[in-house]
Amino acid sequence: MIYGIGTDIIKIARIEAALGRHGDRFAERVLGVEELEKYHRRKAKVAARGLRFLATRFAAKEAFSKAIGLGMHMPMTWRAAQILNAPSGQPIVVTSGKLAEFMQENGLTAQVSITDEVEYAVAFVIVEKK
């Protein structure tokens, strides 16, 4: 049964501006440990790839927060939800801490789809109740 649906679109230039103002502290605030490692690897190869990666993760977390009905309020925090990849490459939502407890206690699972184009990053999340 569908518990919630969330979507988000962000102009990549907004993320670029935030990085310009705050440097990598912005990425450190938004990304979990594994995401941050991947961000730095991509950024080291091509700066634009790092930027797009950060923008898609930002959009996915916003969409996820909407789908679970909490917005960015506890137990939902930027770093408690990571958007990682299954071995197939499919993006997956991995939660930790109080957010993982919330998901388990409520019998929730999430499916996420992300994409980016020159100017925008978009994410769509469906949360299901078992």
From Swiss-Prot:
Keywords: Cytoplasm, Fatty acid biosynthesis, Fatty acid metabolism, Lipid biosynthesis, Lipid metabolism, Magnesium, Metal-binding, Transferase. It comes from Herminiimonas arsenicoxydans. The gene is acpS. It is found in: Cytoplasm. GO terms for molecular function: holo-[acyl-carrier-protein] synthase activity; magnesium ion binding. Its cofactor is Mg(2+). Mg(2+) binds at D8, E62. Transmembrane segments: none annotated. Belongs to the P-Pant transferase superfamily. AcpS family. It catalyses: apo-[ACP] + CoA = holo-[ACP] + adenosine 3',5'-bisphosphate + H(+). The lineage of its organism: Bacteria, Pseudomonadati, Pseudomonadota, Betaproteobacteria, Burkholderiales. NCBIfam families: acpS, pantethn_trn. Transfers the 4'-phosphopantetheine moiety from coenzyme A to a Ser of acyl-carrier-protein. This is Holo-[acyl-carrier-protein] synthase. GO terms for cellular component: cytoplasm. The keyword Zinc-finger does not apply. GO terms for biological process: fatty acid biosynthetic process. Its main location: cytoplasm. Its EC number is 2.7.8.7.
